[in-house]
Amino acid sequence: LTLVVVTIVCLDLGYTLTCLICPEEYCKRIHTCRDGENVCFKGFYEGKQLGKQFRRGCAATCPEGKPNEIVQCCSTDECNH
């Protein structure tokens, strides 16, 4: 019985990544990613007219940045703060 419990705990069945998802600089909104989305990302751009702009979310792979945007990716829960 102990071996069965240890096996289930180690397999971590049904794990789903959670990422922050909001356009603000300081984000607290947590989103559960869909199956296949194994990366959290944060994009940052500072424009002359609109000031600082952020985008955060889940992705299957690290997205490419838009022109003049810096994108950072990670793969642990809520790592895209």
UniProtKB/Swiss-Prot annotation:
Subcellular location: Secreted
Any single Pfam family the record assigns to this protein: Toxin_cobra-type
GO terms under cellular component: extracellular region
One annotated GO molecular function: ion channel regulator activity
Cystines in this chain: 19-40, 22-27, 33-58, 62-73, 74-79
Record's signal peptide: 1-16
Tissue expression profile of the protein: Expressed by the venom gland.
Keyword annotations: Acetylcholine receptor inhibiting toxin, Disulfide bond, Ion channel impairing toxin, Neurotoxin, Postsynaptic neurotoxin, Secreted, Signal, Toxin
Primary residence: secreted
Family: Belongs to the three-finger toxin family. Ancestral subfamily. Orphan group II sub-subfamily.
Function: Binds with low affinity to muscular (alpha-1-beta-1-delta-epsilon/CHRNA1-CHRNB1-CHRND-CHRNE) and very low affinity to neuronal (alpha-7/CHRNA7) nicotinic acetylcholine receptor (nAChR).
Protein name per the record: Weak neurotoxin OH-72
Taxonomic source organism: Ophiophagus hannah
